[in-house]
């Protein structure tokens, strides 16, 4: 074992020191951003969104969440257990809504990403792409340090060169670089930092989120790729700190889990209503999706 002696920081360890600003009002701040990437043929692609994205979890990565967020400029990564027919129905509805509002047909769908696991086939992606334009896909795995993840990224990139590929999760520069060179456009940063995640408690694996973002963002940006902070945000200021640390996107789970559009079961306790929130590697999630 090697002990890392450098100070490692989390969101609650720092504050943002103010600086001079040319802005007269917060209303002048442009919160939309256009993200660009190119495939092996050099063809440039892009999408525009407010770079805050609902996590691809059973509670937050729901179709109802995708409808509301995408229409308001935000993003949603659908949880991986949706059938392609359900996603196609969602995209059809969003496209119809966009046309009725005199917007580009992909105005809303560009902000909704699919999710696959490391052992999943590409059938669902193929079925959706037959019917609609798909902007991005998340390759989701609890341990982004498995060597076979690199092979999976290469497979997705080879078959779908036009897709914006998000891969995670990692917390160090070396694997960030490896996955980008394999074909990833964006890395999800964070292990054990999520509200529903018990990785740190059960295995002792993880890294303070702010330091992870800083280092991984530096590595990714040198290769013209992006990073997505995933986990650890409990209050709005944490989102601000993640962006200041270099995150291009911020993924939210717990902060959205109580919304009406979230998928958790509602229950009442001491006269107050709550929604169930669970991690995707939890016993509850495994029993729900795999029996």
Q: Predicted segments — roles?
A:
Residues 44-54, 104-115, 134-136, 155-171, ...:
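Short beta-strand/loop segments at the ligand-binding rim of alpha/beta enzyme cores
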């Amino acid at each position: 074992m090697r002990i890392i002696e450098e100070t490692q920081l989390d969101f609650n360890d720092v504050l943002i020191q103010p600086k001079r600003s040319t802005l007269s009002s917060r209303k002048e701040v442009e919160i939309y951003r256009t993200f660009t990437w190119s495939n092996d043929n050099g063809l440039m692609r892009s999408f525009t969104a407010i770079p805050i994205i609902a996590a691809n979890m059973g509670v937050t990565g729901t179709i109802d969440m995708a409808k509301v967020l995408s229409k308001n400029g935000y993003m949603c990564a659908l949880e991986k257990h949706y059938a392609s027919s359900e996603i196609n129905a969602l995209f059809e509805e969003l496209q119809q809504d966009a046309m009725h509002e005199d917007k580009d047909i992909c105005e809303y769908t560009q902000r909704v990403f699919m999710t696959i696991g490391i052992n999943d086939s590409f059938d669902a992606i193929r079925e959706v792409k037959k019917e609609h334009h798909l902007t991005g896909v998340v390759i989701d795995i609890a341990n982004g340090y498995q060597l076979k993840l690199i092979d999976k990224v290469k497979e997705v990139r080879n078959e779908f060169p036009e897709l914006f590929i998000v891969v995670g999760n990692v917390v160090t520069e070396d694997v960030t670089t490896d996955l980008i060179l394999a074909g990833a456009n964006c890395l999800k940063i964070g292990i054990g930092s999520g509200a529903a995640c018990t990785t740190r408690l059960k295995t002792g694996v993880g890294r303070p989120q702010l330091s992870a973002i800083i280092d991984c963002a530096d590595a990714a940006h040198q290769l013209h790729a992006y990073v997505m902070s995933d986990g650890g945000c409990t209050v709005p200021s944490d989102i601000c700190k993640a962006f200041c640390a270099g995150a291009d996107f911020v993924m939210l789970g717990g902060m959205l889990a109580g919304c009406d559009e979230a998928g958790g079961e509602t229950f009442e306790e001491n006269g107050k209503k709550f929604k169930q929130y669970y991690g995707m590697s939890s016993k509850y999630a495994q029993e729900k999706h795999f029996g």
